[in-house]
Amino acid sequence: MKNLQITAYTQSFIRQQVMPGDICIDATMGNGNDTALLSRLAGEKGHVLAFDIQKQALEHTEERLKKDNCPENYRLILDSHENMAAYAEMETVSCITFNLGYLPGGDHSVATRADSSKRAVESGLTLLKKGGLMTLCIYSGGDTGFQERDEMLAFVRQLDPHKYLVIRSEYANRPNNPPIPVPVSYTHLTLPTILR
């Protein structure tokens, strides 16, 4: 294993999940890295919704998608991720990805916040189809502090284990509060009666 970056680790889950024709959501568009990946994986017959509250993010993402020759299967939306349910139907989405923090190279005073991120995750969970995947990459420290990280980790910890599989991974020996990836799978498990 070479110097594995958290983004590559998270994207490995996404690559295994998304199939041609899938509906996907990039809840925090940023510079469009995940939007581009989702667009390529979903292909011509798929559809990608990408959200951000900063016009700069939409402009950067549009440039990125054109430069990468991505299929025109996407819709870039200037709106908060907590409103994603207004743009997709329940239980139709294969993959939703979040990068929580602020836009790299952007205004650090504009960042995701725990209250809106929790509402967005709750909304997103209703959109996932059975077998769907949500990935959270939680950045903390620096300008954004630790409140969102702590609240989001507590929130996913309490998700119904009969419906969701939540995995928390982190660097054990990296300083400076490295990001924490958290994949959440909508499994809708049926546990044996003895385990209920």
Regions found by a protein language model. Name each.
Residues G131-I138:
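Conserved beta-strand signature within the Rossmann-like core of class I S-adenosyl-L-methionine
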Residues H47-D52:
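Conserved SAM-binding motif I beta-strand of class I
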Residues T187-T193:
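Conserved small/polar residues in nucleotide/adenosyl-binding loops
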Residues D22-G30:
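Conserved class I S-adenosyl-L-methionine
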Residues M1-P20, E62-A88:
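S-adenosyl-L-methionine
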Residues Y87-C95:
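A short acidic, Gly/Pro-enriched loop at the edge of an enzyme's catalytic core
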